């Protein structure tokens, strides 16, 4: 089997920028790898995810139902697009994965049920659906003040373009708490991406990511 390394983080943390940097670095090193990203909006398997984020199921959709929407998208992607590469031993670098359910949907669950939700998620995605467990996960920890500013810039100041999750700052604060909770339980690497209202340089974060990836390349 190959190695599956997952980069996750809240919206506006700089995942896309860092993936560009990592792609260039790994290519220059001659590393044979496959890059994947979730949700896979270009595929029909993401249809329910799109409806959920557009608010078509309301703002109180069951976190178990929402988790299933994302999980099915990942299952389809694995079976159709990267299972062969993974089983052939290739390095897979994922932007988001099962880990996002352990952030966004955990945050939508009562805090006293967090351990039970994570137990359910592990059994559902890895055992029942048969998705590969990540070999390593890093969480890009960008201060919310910075990520909100970056998202506003991304949408040219049009707040209406933000999805169900992106526009709820209080929810995103809980998402960060959930991410750090999952990180502690599952041994994720947390990479700070800024301090206060200032982001760290792109290069500094890339160096931290490459150090994290070193055992797999």
What feature does the model see in each segment?
Residues 7:
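Hydrophobic anchor at the beta1->P-loop junction of P-loop NTPases
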Residues 23, 145-217:
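NTP-dependent small-molecule kinase module
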Residues 1-4:
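Pre-Walker A (Motif I) flank of P-loop NTPase domains
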Residues 99-177:
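A glycine- and Lys/Arg-enriched "phosphate-lid" helix/loop adjacent to the NTP-binding pocket
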Residues 15:
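Conserved lysine of the Walker
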Residues 18:
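Hydrophobic positions on the alpha1 helix immediately C-terminal to the Walker A/P-loop
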Residues 29-129:
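ATP-dependent small-molecule kinase phosphotransfer cores
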Residues 10:
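P-loop (Walker A) phosphate-binding loop of NTP-binding proteins
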């Amino acid at each position: 089997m190959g190695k599956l390394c997952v980069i996750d983080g809240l919206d506006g943390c700089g995942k896309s920028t860092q993936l560009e940097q990592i792609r260039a670095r790994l290519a220059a090193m001659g590393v044979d790898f496959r890059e994947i990203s979730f949700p896979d909006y270009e595929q029909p398997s993401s249809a329910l995810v799109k409806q959920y984020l557009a608010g078509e199921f309301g703002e109180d959709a069951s976190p178990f139902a929402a988790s299933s929407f994302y999980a099915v998208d990942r299952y389809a992607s694995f079976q159709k697009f990267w299972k062969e590469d993974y089983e052939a031993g290739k390095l897979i670098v994922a932007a988001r994965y099962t880990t996002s359910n352990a952030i966004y949907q955990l945050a939508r669950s009562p805090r006293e049920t967090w351990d039970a939700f994570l137990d359910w998620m592990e059994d559902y995605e890895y055992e029942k659906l048969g998705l590969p467990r990540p070999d390593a996960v890093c969480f890009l920890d960008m201060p919310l003040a910075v990520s909100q500013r970056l998202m506003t810039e991304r949408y040219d100041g049009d707040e209406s373009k933000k999805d169900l999750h992106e526009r709820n700052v209080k929810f995103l604060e809980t998402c960060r708490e959930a991410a750090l909770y999952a990180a502690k339980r599952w041994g994720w690497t947390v990479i700070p991406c800024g301090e206060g209202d200032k982001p760290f340089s792109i290069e500094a974060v890339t160096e931290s990511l490459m150090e994290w990836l070193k055992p797999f390349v």
